[in-house]
């Protein structure tokens, strides 16, 4: 698709560019308004003149129908909650197939993304505003029992407003309803350096022994813990030399640390978010309550190492055969919209108490540390 061409009433303003290997992106105009447009590189809908036997083409059509239903169901759920454009969630306002390709349309947003290194240099109260705004956006999604699946700073663009900061949430290509990820694991790409242990195990399980029920909103919480490390310290968690990703380190009981000394409540929160067992992680409402109740006058002595720095040997590793023994500990958010300032001021404080469970797994041996 090239500049000047028209598709379903959208005039393409720029040649499409490959983005992330799974899609091409551009901008388009319709009825005098500019939109963001994405073309999916897969799946491709087989037409009557497409190569291959009719049996193979029918299989591909079925896969495309499932892909289309998945995206429409997500878009409808988010759209009903957000009621139009201009909100915190930048979701697809149009989704269609043209020929063999699928396209997604979202509103165009003009937001400059802050590098995490710059965010970490802000006063703590400003970093907290950014973190709470990010949580507000994510809790809308979790209130619908939808897992984002690809949280990262690029998908949480920040806008500086007159009264603070607004963090949007974009790119729901890897999103799914809690416990029901797409069966085609190859299309659940995400961003490996932000994987949770259970997300990595599910995607990398070639024998497909790990059930989708293991993937809940708590997977996003692990990823958000990595992002919070970037917000508050300027970098992802510091890992031992043998590990490349946070999830491999946590999965093998490795110790993590941070680039700089963190406020004790923030340090403790991030460590809980990075728990191996999803049941030991706070839900998104509990994360918000901790951030809301941070006491800025508390100072961590630089010469004192936090007791929580000592790693605990994990009681499980995610691997083939892993099944949650219950749904306890997976506490869905109770709100589906971001709270107003009045609601925030009235919200009852919630003391976070992690739930310890007897989860066990047989261990997925992953070469890439």
PLM feature spans:
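Short beta-strand micro-motifs within the conserved protein kinase catalytic domain, predominantly
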Residues: 89-102
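Activation segment signature within eukaryotic-like protein kinase domains
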Residues: 130-131
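Conserved catalytic-loop aspartate of Hanks-type protein kinases
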Residues: 220
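ATP-binding glycine-rich loop module of kinase domains
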Residues: 24, 29-73
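Catalytic-loop of the protein kinase fold
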Residues: 142-159
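A conserved short helix/loop substructure at the end of the activation segment
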Residues: 274-286
């Amino acid at each position: 698709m090239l500049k000047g061409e028209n598709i379903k009433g959208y005039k393409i303003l720029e040649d499409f560019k490959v983005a992330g290997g799974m899609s091409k992106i551009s901008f388009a105009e319709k009825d005098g308004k500019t939109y963001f447009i994405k073309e999916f590189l897969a799946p491709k809908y087989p037409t009557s003149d497409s190569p291959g036997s009719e049996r193979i083409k029918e299989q591909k059509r079925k896969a495309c129908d499932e892909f289309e239903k998945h995206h429409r169901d997500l878009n409808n759920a988010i759209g009903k909650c957000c009621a139009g454009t201009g909100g915190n969630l930048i979701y697809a306002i149009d989704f269609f197939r043209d020929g063999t390709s699928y396209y997604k349309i979202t509103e165009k947003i003009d937001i400059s993304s802050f590098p995490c290194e710059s965010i970490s240099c802000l006063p703590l109260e400003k970093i907290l505003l950014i973190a709470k705004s990010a949580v507000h956006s994510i809790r809308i999604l979790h209130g619908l029992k939808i897992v984002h699946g690809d949280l990262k700073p690029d998908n949480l663009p920040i806008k500086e407003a007159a009264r603070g900061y607004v963090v949007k949430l974009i790119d729901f290509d890897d999103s799914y309803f809690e416990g029901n990820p797409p069966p085609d694991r190859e299309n659940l790409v995400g961003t490996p350096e932000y994987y949770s242990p259970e997300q990595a195990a599910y995607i990398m399980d070639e024998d497909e022994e790990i059930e989708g029920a293991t993937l809940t909103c708590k997977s996003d919480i692990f990823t958000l813990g990595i992002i919070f490390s970037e917000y508050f310290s300027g970098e992802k968690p510091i890992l031992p030399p043998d590990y490349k990703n946070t999830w491999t380190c946590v999965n093998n009981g490795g110790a993590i640390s941070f680039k700089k000394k963190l406020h004790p409540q923030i340090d403790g929160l991030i460590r809980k978010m990075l728990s191996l067992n999803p049941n030991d992680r706070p839900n998104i409402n509990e994360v918000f309550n901790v951030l809301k109740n941070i006491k800025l006058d508390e100072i961590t002595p630089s010469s004192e190492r936090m007791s929580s720095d000592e790693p605990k040997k994990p009681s499980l590793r995610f691997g083939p055969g892993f099944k949650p023994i219950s749904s306890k500990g997976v506490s869905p958010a109770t709100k589906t919209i971001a709270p107003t300032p009045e609601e925030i001021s009235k919200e009852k404080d919630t003391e976070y108490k992690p739930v310890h469970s007897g989860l066990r797994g047989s261990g997925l041996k992953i070469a890439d540390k």
